[in-house]
């Protein structure tokens, strides 16, 4: 949904996203064979990163920021059914939530406005993408107990996008060495918030501690 990649903006599917992530880590490892490789995923990217780690991505550690792990039994059957029906009947319908859903993603209002004007940012997900996100979150939840890489989880207490309980559950399920950083003034876009420098510093310190 973001960036300058060629081709149409279509949902590639969970398997493609996970495979692409694994391929990128292999490429980075090839180019920098003497450096550790850490995979960072934010929101949906956190779910993809967690699933990719379990699928054999060649990494030394994992960083999950506000990860999308609201899957498995956390998603009620009626919600799943509605998402499936929407993806089947109106797959390309985009949902803005305007007038119905009021969610603030960050306390950095100028950055939110800039993102809203950026043509490379697609903020309104389609029905197909909603269903795809659910599948990714299911994969991430199932993967967590099998992931043994050192993992740093980041979460903001003011996050209005990712609920805290699934993040806490995924953290507890992780099988390897793990660290949780919680930010009382943090929102969903932790790396764009007004205190983003604090978050980036914590990431850098954690990586240094792994060496």
Specify the residue positions occupied by each region the protein language model found:
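Alpha/beta-hydrolase fold nucleophile elbow
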Residues: 32-43
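Alpha/beta-hydrolase active-site loop signature
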Residues: 1-3, 69, 187
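Catalytic nucleophile-loop/oxyanion-hole region of alpha/beta-hydrolase
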Residues: 3-33
């Amino acid at each position: 949904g973001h960036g300058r990649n060629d081709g149409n903006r279509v949902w590639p599917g969970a398997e493609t996203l996970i495979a692409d992530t694994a391929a990128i880590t292999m490429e980075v490892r090839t180019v920098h064979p003497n450096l550790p490789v850490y995979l960072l995923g934010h929101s949906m990217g956190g779910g993809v990163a967690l699933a990719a780690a379990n699928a054999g991505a060649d990494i030394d550690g994992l960083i999950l920021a506000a990860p999308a792990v609201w899957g498995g039994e956390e998603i009620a059957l009626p919600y799943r059914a509605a998402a499936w029906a929407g993806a089947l009947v109106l797959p390309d319908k985009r949902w803005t939530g305007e007038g119905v859903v009021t969610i603030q993603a960050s306390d950095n209002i100028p950055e939110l406005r800039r993102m809203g004007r950026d043509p490379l940012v697609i903020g309104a997900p389609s029905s197909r993408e909603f269903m795809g996100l659910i599948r990714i979150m299911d994969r991430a939840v199932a993967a967590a107990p099998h992931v043994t890489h050192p993992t740093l989880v980041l979460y903001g207490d003011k996050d209005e996008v990712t609920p805290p309980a699934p993040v806490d559950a995924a953290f507890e399920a992780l099988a390897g060495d793990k660290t949780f950083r919680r930010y009382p003034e943090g929102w969903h876009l932790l790396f764009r918030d007004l205190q983003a420098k604090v978050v980036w510093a914590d990431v850098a310190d954690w990586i240094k501690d792994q060496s």
